[in-house]
Amino acid sequence: MFLLYEYDIFWAFLIISSAIPILAFLISGVLAPINKGPEKLSSYESGIEPMGDAWLQFRIRYYMFALVFVVFDVETVFLYPWAMSFDVLGVSVFIEALIFVLILIVGSVYAWRKGALEWS
C-alpha cells in the first residue's frame, strides 16, 4: 500500500531548503545600506584608478581549453567513486565504466582533430 506520509521528511527538507535562501536574500535586501554615489559606481582595479578601456575581448581558445578541462574534471568526479568501490561492484559496472571512458576518449580525439587543443 502506497502511503503519502512516507514522503513527509522529503517535503519538509524541500520547504526548508527553499525557504533558507529566499529568507537570506530578503533579509540582506532589508538590512543592506543603500549608499549610491560616484565612488560606489566607479570600477576598482587593485587599489588604483582604472586607465584605458575596460572592455577586453578574450580569445576563443581560452574558452575551448576551459571547456575541455571541465569535461575531464567531470570525468574524474564520476570515476573516483567507481574506483573506490571497484572490488564490490562487479564486472557489469566495470563494463559500464569502460564504455564511459571510451566515449570520453572518442570526444577527446574529436576535439583534437578539430584543433580545439592546439594553440595557434
Swiss-Prot record:
It is a multi-pass membrane protein. The keyword rRNA-binding does not apply. Pfam families: Oxidored_q4. One of its GO terms (cellular component) is NADH dehydrogenase complex. It is found in: Plastid, Chloroplast thylakoid membrane. One of its GO terms (biological process) is photosynthesis, light reaction. Its main location: plastid. Its EC number is 7.1.1.-. It comes from the Eukaryota. One of its GO terms (molecular function) is quinone binding. It catalyses: a plastoquinone + NADH + (n+1) H(+)(in) = a plastoquinol + NAD(+) + n H(+)(out); a plastoquinone + NADPH + (n+1) H(+)(in) = a plastoquinol + NADP(+) + n H(+)(out). InterPro entries: NAD(P)H_OxRDtase_bac/plastid, NADH_UbQ/plastoQ_OxRdtase_su3, NDAH_ubi_oxred_su3_sf. The keyword NADP applies. Keywords: Chloroplast, Membrane, NAD, NADP, Plastid, Plastoquinone, Quinone, Thylakoid, Translocase, Transmembrane, Transmembrane helix, Transport. Signal peptide: none annotated. The chain crosses the membrane at residues 9-29, 64-84, 88-108. NDH is composed of at least 16 different subunits, 5 of which are encoded in the nucleus. HAMAP family: NDH1_NuoA. NDH shuttles electrons from NAD(P)H:plastoquinone, via FMN and iron-sulfur (Fe-S) centers, to quinones in the photosynthetic chain and possibly in a chloroplast respiratory chain. The immediate electron acceptor for the enzyme in this species is believed to be plastoquinone. Couples the redox reaction to proton translocation, and thus conserves the redox energy in a proton gradient. Belongs to the complex I subunit 3 family. This is NAD(P)H-quinone oxidoreductase subunit 3, chloroplastic. The gene is ndhC.
